[in-house]
């Protein structure tokens, strides 16, 4: 090692000419069992420094195994111990003696850059590596793996209280999100109307785009995070290696400084001894010259002889001295080279520290950016949750609207069917109405013809035959004995059914089956055409009834009743005839009062049709012969009823005044 070589050189320079130990090397000060008193305090100081360095190295290793929080605490402790270490270094530098190596040691401990390089050789390197930002300045342009390697440790040291990382979005979450978005589009397009579907589709597209952008950003952040973690691991490994190298170099510098101090002390002691020996020799020579002034040439000659006698040993010593001087010169050159190398190493260390400081600043900036991105990520997570809730609400609304639209479509279809039925019915009713109008006009013409024919028949003399055929369309009443009964019964039943059941009226008048008219009682209110048809039919019925019920337009029935029947009726016993006639009159009056009441109710309900339509099987089954026969029978019955009523009032109706056919018809009509 370098201290041993320096010790050997100094020992060779202190040997005397006749010393037998000249060929041996002087022992090093650290190997001596009893050091000098002046060197003991310094040895204690160096031992303390070495112990502090060892403890700091062990502390660094233990902190490297633990987390970032103990490292930060150790950094704070190191920062707290910094002033005392610096003052101790300055005291050591001031207490050193003024020799040739003192400026070099001062350069080693203090350096050419002021207080930034302090702490070398005193165990402060670990503190510098723990907290580099407190010891260095700034240097721009640093990049590469060194910049990214120190990020994670600085993040742990600068931000120990960061919140735990948010749960990462995995590929399964992305698939679920895309599946939900794919499920939303078809029901929305099928269920909602066109405008709402477009609006919701735009909303869903925006939500899908937002989700995809969030997924992309999350994947990019995950990749960056993995890269930063890899760089941080490499940076930690490099930091551990550099710390180990720095500790080794710190120990070497400490040993070198201690050996230099010991060599300087030994050289000073040897110089003092040589000066004392030279003074003693000079004093001895002076004493000899003073005591024997005449013997001086002899002594000189003796000394010359002695020098001549010891010449080979002297030459060997001189050669050895020359070799030692050359070796010392080489060692000096090596020392200067080592100094330059140490200066370069010091500059490199300072550059590394500056790079680490810049990396720490960049890490702080990156940590701020990371915090902002985490906040943005949390906001995006909240936005995604809110959008998911909105999507669920929209799904529920879409389902509700779909059910409502289905109901409305069903109602619309039913309404369309009803509307089509009503349109068909209105068309059919219009055609029926037109037919009825034509038939009514025909019946009116025929009625006028019949009235004219009846007038002509009235003007003709009565015929003695018993037939009632005064016109070509009439039928004798004797040939139809039960016609009046059936006619009255049919009139009553038809009127009652028309009043009670309008469906029966429609079946009888418009030839509709029972299944087709089941829904008519509910559809009357929706058709204005039907109301108009009803009103028109009621007016026609009233007009027909008025035309039929006019007494002056009808032909009296006396002309059609033969005299033989009137004469035969007088043969009935008087008492029985009177009782029967009274009963018949009372029953018939009651029956016609009921019929008139029913007719009044029917007119109020706008359901009564013409008497011609009600008397038969409907307008489709009417025949002209049948209608004329009904009119004749109606006139005959009415005239007979009037005649009988007049005869009862006058008391002129004897026993058997009415024929048997008329009595049976009256009874059946009353029943």
Curated annotation (Swiss-Prot):
Skewed-composition ranges (Acidic residues): 258-288
Start-end of Low complexity biased regions: 20-29
InterPro entries with a match to the protein in the record: HAP1_N (IPR006933), Intracell_Traff-Reg (IPR051946)
HAP1 N-terminal domain ranges (all copies): 106-461
Highest taxon of source: Eukaryota
GO cellular component annotations of the record: actin cytoskeleton; autophagosome; axon cytoplasm; centriole; centrosome; cytoplasmic vesicle; cytoskeleton; cytosol
Keywords: Autophagy, Cell projection, Cilium biogenesis/degradation, Coiled coil, Cytoplasm, Cytoplasmic vesicle, Cytoskeleton, Endoplasmic reticulum, Endosome, Exocytosis, Lysosome, Mitochondrion, Nucleus, Protein transport, Synapse, Transport
Name of the protein described by the UniProt record: Huntingtin-associated protein 1
One biological process term in Gene Ontology: positive regulation of non-motile cilium assembly
Tissue expression remark: Predominantly expressed in brain. Selectively expressed in neurons.
Subcellular location as annotated: Cytoplasm; Cell projection, Axon; Presynapse; Cytoplasm, Cytoskeleton
